[in-house]
Structure formats: C-alpha cells, structure tokens
Amino acid sequence: MFEKVRQLLSRYFDRHPAAKRTAGWLRKRKRRLLTWFFIFAHLAGALTSVRAIMEVRTAQGAIAWTVALNTVPYVSVPAYWIFGRSKFQGYVIARRKDLAHTSSIHLQYLVNLTNRGLVANPTLGHSLAVERLARMRFTRGNDAELLVDGDATFKSIFEGIEQAKEYVLVEFYIIRKDNTGGELKRRLVEKARQGVRVYVLYDEVGSPDLIESSLTELRDAGVDVRRFNTTQGRANRWQLNFRNHRKIVVVDGQTAWIGGLNVGDEYLGRDPTIGAWRDTHVKVTGPVVQGVQVAFLEDWHWASQQLLKLNWDPQPSPSGARRVALSLPTGPADSLETCTLFFLNAINAATNRLWLASPYFVPDEQFVSALQLAALRGVDVRVLLPDKTDNKLVQLSGWSYLDELEKVGIKVYRYQKGLMHQKVTFIDDLYCTIGTANFDNRSFRLNFEITMAFADAEFAGQVRRMLEQDFADAKPVKAQELKDRGFWFRFSVRCARLMAPIQ
C-alpha cells in the first residue's frame, strides 16, 4: 500500500514541477517549521488559558483547562474553542437584548393569570424561589397526561395536530429524515394547506439532515421553518455549546407536549441497531400551556426576528382538572444558572423521597453533596440510569460516582429493557418534573432546556408508579462492581470523570 502511495506521489511530482519544488523546500526547512509550529502552538495555548481563567465558571474547570492548554496545546486549543467556552459573552448579550422584544408579552401573560384567578400558591417548600427562577407562576386549572414511550407520545401529538384550528408550534433538537420525521412533515403540510399557521424550529447542530433542499415541501405548503443558531454562517456547526435542546409542541395556545423524545424512528424503538427506547413525555392543557408558548416565542424571535400573533388568553383546562403546574425554561443567557438552582432547590426540599431518572448523569460536586445530604436526612434517594447508552463517555463517567453515592445509602439502578432516555424527578409524593434537562453540566449551564414542574399528589402518584415499574426493570449497581473491573477500565472511568464539565 505504501509503495503504491509513493508511486502516485512520484508521478504527481513528475507532472507538477512546482509542487515538487514546494515539497523540496518544505523538507529542507522541516526542522525550522516544526520549531515555529511548536512556538505558535504553545503561545496559542498560553493566550487561550488566560481566556479560560477569565471565563470558566469553576476553579476546578479553570485549572483543568489551564494545565491542558499549556501542556498539550495541539489538542486542547481546538478542543477549548469547540467545547470549552461556557460564556460566549457576545451571544449572551445579544440574546438578552432579544428577550426585551418579548418581555411585554411575557408580562401580559402573567397579568392575565392574576386577573383570571389562575395563580396557585402550592404548599411545596421554596416555591417562591422556583417562581423567581422561572420568571413564571405556579398556575391552577391544568390537566396532565403522562405519555410513556414513543408510540403513545407521537400518537397524542399527531392527534393534537389534527385538531389544530389556528396554529401549531413545533420545536425539537433533533428531527430526522425518516419515517417518523416524514409522518410529522405530512401532517404539518396538511394543516398548513388547510389554512392553519404552522411554525417549525429546529437546532442546526442537532438536525444536520435538515438541509435547505429537504425543507422545500414544508415551505411550499406555507410552513414557516427556521433553524436555531448561536452564530451565523458555517461557524455555527462548530459551536457545540448553547444548543437548543428543547422539545415543544403547542396547538392553539391550549395544549402542549414536553419531554425527552425527539423526532426519529429510534425514539419509537424502530432502529434495530439501538433497540427498545424508554422515554417519557407529558401532554398538558390549561394556563401553563402559555408559559410553554412564551419559551417558544422567545426562541422563535431569536431565530427569525418575528413576533408571532398567538393566543395569550389563559383558560382552565376543559377537563375541569385543577392540577398545579409551572413551566421552567432555562438557558445560558439567563442572568442566574436557572437550571442548576432549580434542581438544587428540588433536592434540598426533599424530606421523604427523591427519585431521579436521567440518561446522562454527570453531576458536579455541589449536586453530589446535595444528594448525599438528602440521603443523610433520611430521604429515600434513588438514581435510575441506562445500562445501554448512546454516549460511552458519559456512561464511563457515571461509574465514578458509585462509591460517593453508595456510602450514604443512595441506590443506583441501571435500566435493562432498552435505552432509557427520560428526564424525570419525583419528590415527596407531591412534586415531580418531566422535561428535557439531563443531570449534567451541558443541561445545567450550556443548553436551552425546558422542564414542566407539577405540585399535584395525584399526578405525582402516576409518575411514582411509572418509576416503580422502571426500577423493577432495572438492576441495582454497586461500587464493588467497579472495583472488580480491570485496571484499564477503572483508569478510563477516572479519565472520563476529568472531562465531566464538557460532557
């Protein structure tokens, strides 16, 4: 093989004397060029480490990046500019300015809630802090339907789209060009041709299949399709932080769907290379829907600079249910680390039970400490993780937490019946959340997420029964299992833990 390559190069240089002269010039100056490359790489590493010290949020992260940037800059400098920037200040400032255009609508929604007597005062501890973080209010008069797995979820979403009379809002991180994506497209095209306004927002990095040519049928039917970018141009595809990880569908401002499922065949368990897919979504009706709509409006305005005319008249659910719920959109442009503080508050509020399910479990030290303190208070703390995963690095990192959690009595389980992707918490038989946020740094600080929080004993009971079945379909994991593994596996686990801030 190498001989063939040598012959090809020889023939090429024979035909192109200028290239041959250039190659000879490079060979003669190889040592000097390598020296200059070495100097340039380390200078770039030193300058980038100054930026890392100024911008990385934690001391541990700043130290890790500084060491890497100054010792192996050839790898770490490009890695930092792709993964490491947790404060893209220009974007954050622009995003906050953009929110000013939608703030009056947001405020009017909150005023309408109060005027209609739809604001709730849940007995859940620290609810005021949650409302201030969310910039939303807990509302009464909602109903919720728990949707377990993809078939139930997309059946519900497609039925809801069929019933739309005014508009449909669709926002997903991933939309595939497969059977499921095609079915969604068909239904949206059909509604648009009936005169219903249809808006679709997708993340450009999460949905690389959706090139402009594949969107022609949607646009020809009158569907307004936009992509979510953090920067303009080709550079956006290299910006892996600040992605829009939300999964939202809203119909007529009266019904919304939120949860862990993207649009694709694998999310319905139809990809033989992945197998069964375990996930959770929720359908809500009532005044909380317009809180979800606020999040969509803000994202849409960022992507299009358009303010949509939507229904902002909050009404109780037609079912007559009075569930208390709150919509919590979070993202890197928030003035506080909203997602981090929300889940820390939830952990600290637990007095009896704290069960959480997350496909990506890479908590930082403050979350590990909060979970340990909850267990020491006598709270039944359980963590449900996938056994089969689509991210080996995250799975390796997850092993590193077993000893810290087990020593205080926290029980860790790995789900056995397929790939588990749900993002669910259950607290004290009253409070539960379903949404898009994983238990990792990327969801807590770097991505746009949305979580639906419920303070309702009956609905929390449904979530409890669902999780009890999931725990029954899982196996307990002990720290001894890691100790019994070989040295190189344990070494890989520790190395993966070092990369937790960028996972």
Where does each model-flagged region fall?
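Helical hairpin unit composed of two closely spaced alpha helices linked by a short loop
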Residues: A350, Y360-R382, P386-D387, N391
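Thr-Gly-centered strand-to-loop micro-motif
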Residues: L356-S358, Y415, I434-G435
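N-terminal localization/anchoring segments of enzymes in phospholipid and broader phosphate metabolism
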Residues: M1-L341, N345, A349, T389, ...
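Catalytic-core elements of nucleic-acid end-processing and repair enzymes
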Residues: K423
